[in-house]
Regions:
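Structural signature of hydrophobic alpha-helical transmembrane segments
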Residues: 1-3, 23, 40-58, 102-117, ...
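N-terminal, positively charged regions that mediate nucleic acid binding
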Residues: 1-34, 40
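C-terminal ends of transmembrane helices
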Residues: 5-18, 57-76, 120-135, 180-190
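Cytoplasmic-side transmembrane-helix entry/capping segments in multi-pass membrane proteins
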Residues: 18-29, 49-52, 71-83, 135-145, ...
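Core segments of transmembrane alpha-helices
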Residues: 30-31, 145-153
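Alpha-helical transmembrane segments of multipass membrane proteins
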Residues: 34-38, 61-62, 153-157, 181-185
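Transmembrane alpha-helix boundary signature
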Residues: 37-50, 62-73, 88-101, 126, ...
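Mid-bilayer segments of alpha-helical transmembrane spans in multi-pass integral membrane proteins
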Residues: 57-62, 81-96, 106-122
Length: 193
């Protein structure tokens, strides 16, 4: 149900007339996901959850009050990047703690989160004017990105064949995903973000 709320909500965000209902549906989807998680029967540290909600709420209000509407794209880029970083940190914590979770799933979460983090911060830098807003392209750029992505796939295959230590694979994926996030974002001009 929450996934449907997210998907329909995101779809409705694509048009100004339906954006409000899209935002509501996506928020409702998130609420359902949170309630489902908290009522799943798992043992949670409610103090930490309350602390996280409290800190997040305070920071959210402070940011919302200070950010002007013209700075909204930059704020979205930062929040997107922080969401990616959170995903990468959760995957890293699961890996370091020796979680029973699938190693491949942890690596994929790390890959997506790290790629999102680096790409979003390049987008923020372009939108904010910290780096050139022009598209940065060079010969062989797409081949380089394909090689990096292929290397990540090869590392996951190497894990399945027990060819490399898990630590080597995990940390190499982190570096490659950071590079790929940058490589995929720099050719996009600031006006197109």
């Amino acid at each position: 149900i929450s996934a449907i709320g997210f998907i329909v909500g995101i779809k409705r965000l694509s048009h100004p007339r339906t954006a409000r209902s899209g935002n509501f549906l996506a928020s409702l989807g998130m609420l359902v996901a949170i309630i489902a998680t908290l009522t799943s029967g798992a043992d949670f540290d409610w103090k930490l959850i309350g602390l996280g909600v409290g800190i997040g709420s305070i920071l959210g209000v402070m940011i919302a009050v200070r950010v002007q509407m013209t700075q909204m794209p930059q704020m979205v880029a930062i929040f997107n990047g922080l969401g990616g970083a959170a995903s990468a940190f959760v995957a890293s914590a699961a890996y370091i703690s020796g979680s029973d979770s699938s190693y491949i799933i942890m690596c994929m979460s790390l890959f997506i989160g790290t790629l999102t983090f680096s790409g979003s911060f390049i987008a923020f830098g372009k939108l904010q004017g910290f780096i050139s807003g022009r598209a940065i392209t060079f010969t062989g750029q797409q081949a380089m990105n394909a090689l990096i992505f292929g290397s990540i796939i090869a590392l996951l295959i190497a894990h399945n064949l027990s060819l490399l230590p898990n630590d080597t694979i995990f940390y190499t994926i982190t570096v490659l995903a950071l590079m790929l996030g940058i490589g995929l974002t720099i050719p996009i001009g600031g006006a197109d973000m």
